[in-house]
Amino acid sequence: MALTAALKAQIAAWYKALQEQIPDFIPRAPQRQMIADVAKTLAGEEGRHLAIEAPTGVGKTLSYLIPGIAIAREEQKTLVVSTANVALQDQIYSKDLPLLKKIIPDLKFTAAFGRGRYVCPRNLTALASTEPTQQDLLAFLDDELTPNNQEEQKRCAKLKGDLDTYKWDGLRDHTDIAIDDDLWRRLSTDKASCLNRNCYYYRECPFFVARREIQEAEVVVANHALVMAAMESEAVLPDPKNLLLVLDEGHHLPDVARDALEMSAEITAPWYRLQLDLFTKLVATCMEQFRPKTIPPLAIPERLNAHCEELYELIASLNNILNLYMPAGQEAEHRFAMGELPDEVLEICQRLAKLTEMLRGLAELFLNDLSEKTGSHDIVRLHRLILQMNRALGMFEAQSKLWRLASLAQSSGAPVTKWATREEREGQLHLWFHCVGIRVSDQLERLLWRSIPHIIVTSATLRSLNSFSRLQEMSGLKEKAGDRFVALDSPFNHCEQGKIVIPRMRVEPSIDNEEQHIAEMAAFFRKQVESKKHLGMLVLFASGRAMQRFLDYVTDLRLMLLVQGDQPRYRLVELHRKRVANGERSVLVGLQSFAEGLDLKGDLLSQVHIHKIAFPPIDSPVVITEGEWLKSLNRYPFEVQSLPSASFNLIQQVGRLIRSHGCWGEVVIYDKRLLTKNYGKRLLDALPVFPIEQPEVPEGIVKKKEKTKSPRRRRR
């Protein structure tokens, strides 16, 4: 489709009308360029897909929404906007699209959040009820559907009242009533515990109401994980050929795709035996009480028992073999080098893939049959069986995918990382098996790049080390396929608005020197606080261990510090805003993930402190396997993995400072390697052009460590 004069005029008219809706709107050349580039790509005038880096201040959201809506209307397609997290998804849904609706009154839009973000009306009704009979009726579903106390019941009753009177849409983030994680776990549901069309509340269920709204909407706001799942199952979203897709925060896409394809499952032999026994009893109950018209051969008791017995024997053998590979001790891990399994393990995985797939098919067949049963049956008993079969299907589906992935030598031209872990829970040892591909470009090509005609991938940061090469390698986007890569200029004058401060630290921030380095960092930070030059500050760490140690050095400043983990992030930011608005000093402290998407302008944030260059962890099974693979190709892992990742992280962290033309301040980076190592210049060259200062550092007095047992974290 060509960009007609009428279409261009429509885009220009909306852009002009938008300027009148936004106070102090500043026209920006990069924004106009982005609108033009997005329009050309979505209309098919230039290239296949577009990766466009739009630095903070460009106004990228409105720059893709305006041309996206215009072209979607012209082509009678649906514009799907996907983000990496719920916060940005909600911002687009609750702020940006309502703003556009002022200039496009008939605009229809909705949001597609994951099932776990919505309340389950069945669970809410039970938890809000004061009638024991109501709770008893729903308790048959094996869920914890009774309130813990009267206060919790009253809270649920208020939520139910808001839902029933349409004051609340059922989304966790859209109510002012405090809901802790434990209560929300009982209020929401997952795919395995949902009765779907068989539920009494199906028609009014917020999740399914939202899904039905997708069919009528011109714009759907989703997230990357949901889009990947929708493309895989060909459900939820319209047909790919009838889509225009924008992937905001597109730098997350390869990781989200990899997470979606990562498979982990418990394979502890006694636990597995129990699951198989429960499934055979479940099948027997279905055959006895809800006999299907056509009996699957595998459902015959003798055959099913033999099938499950073979499956169990293979799992037991695998347990024995894996325990031999793992080091002694209750908690242990073994990774298979280059993802290559021994022949005996590979043969077991291949057979397990076939056997679990057959059980998955059997569970699906019974579930479909049960779902079609009429009201002539005992509805309580039927629904109980549907839920149990649904959960069995979920288990065998995951197992089937795991063993299929374990049987693969490569995925997307790279090895599949495979490892086993043993851990202790409540005095019992549990064995797990894990698989994840280190490259997902083939899957992205199949699900996205080849399926959807034109896609926009955008973010404030898509490049690392001034190059799109890492994005291209990880995502599979490539110029020879007609994909375009554009980096827009920043609208800000960084040279005049801020500066980078690299204190003259006495040591590098290595593990060996960590204690002295943090002592010096704390001393310099204290000096900055005492200067009273900045009201709003942000301190970012590469690890929780370092952050905790830093806090040990500044205990007298603790009341000023708002630390990640003390409260949910949005509450910390809310409190920070209130403090600064009242003229008080406030310091946000967290890990690098805490800063992503943080938008604090002016005095709210005028000094950012960065503990050190954040290289990725090198002890993750995925990173180790990728390193082995790169070395086998005579490529240098530091150049391919570590440095691009560190560059990307640093750009993101530094980008927290200048968010508008009125922002000012300093970025303090406590890492002398930026000036002493060869790669330091490359990292600095990829940052906005700030003047650099190198002040002296007060001597830090090293404190003695208190001996504490560090919690074991699960690696991947």
From Swiss-Prot:
Reported induction: DNA damage-inducible. Transcriptionally regulated by LexA.
Effect of substituting F615A: Loss of helicase activity, loss of ssDNA binding
Keyword 4Fe-4S: yes
Regulation: ATPase activity is 15-fold stimulated by single-stranded DNA (ssDNA). Reduction of the [4Fe-4S] cluster reversibly switches off helicase activity. Remains fully active after exposure to 100-fold excess of hydrogen peroxide, but the [4Fe-4S] cluster can be efficiently modified by nitric oxide (NO), forming the DinG-bound dinitrosyl iron complex with the concomitant inactivation of helicase activity. Helicase activity on G-quadruplex DNA is inhibited by porphyrin derivatives meso-tetra (N-methyl-4-pyridyl) porphine tetra tosylate (T4) and N-methyl mesoporphyrin IX (NMM).
Keyword check for Ubl conjugation: no
Motif (DEAH box): 248-251
Gene Ontology biological process terms, A to Z: DNA repair; SOS response
Catalytic activity: Couples ATP hydrolysis with the unwinding of duplex DNA at the replication fork by translocating in the 5'-3' direction. This creates two antiparallel DNA single strands (ssDNA). The leading ssDNA polymer is the template for DNA polymerase III holoenzyme which synthesizes a continuous strand; ATP + H2O = ADP + phosphate + H(+)
Stated consequence of mutating C199S: Abolishes iron-sulfur-binding
PROSITE patterns, A to Z: HELICASE_ATP_BIND_2
Effect ascribed to mutating R211A: Significant decrease in helicase activity, small decrease in ssDNA binding
GO molecular function terms noted in the UniProt entry: 4 iron, 4 sulfur cluster binding; 5'-3' DNA helicase activity; ATP binding; ATP hydrolysis activity; catalytic activity, acting on a nucleic acid; DNA binding; DNA helicase activity; DNA/RNA helicase activity
Class of the enzyme per the UniProt entry, highest EC level: isomerase
Entry remark concerning the domains of this protein: Has 4 domains; the discontinous helicase 1 (HD1), helicase 2 (HD2), arch and Fe-S cluster domains. The arch domain sits above the other domains and contacts the Fe-S cluster domain above the ssDNA-binding surface. Addition of an ATP analog to a DinG-ssDNA crystal induces changes in the relative orientation of the domains; HD1 remains tightly bound while HD2 slides along the DNA, upon ATP hydrolysis HD1 slides while HD2 remains tightly bound, thus the enzyme translocates in a 5'-3' direction along the ssDNA.
Known partners and oligomeric status: Monomer in solution.
Protein name: ATP-dependent DNA helicase DinG
UniProt source species: Escherichia coli (strain K12)
Lineage of origin: Bacteria, Pseudomonadati, Pseudomonadota, Gammaproteobacteria, Enterobacterales
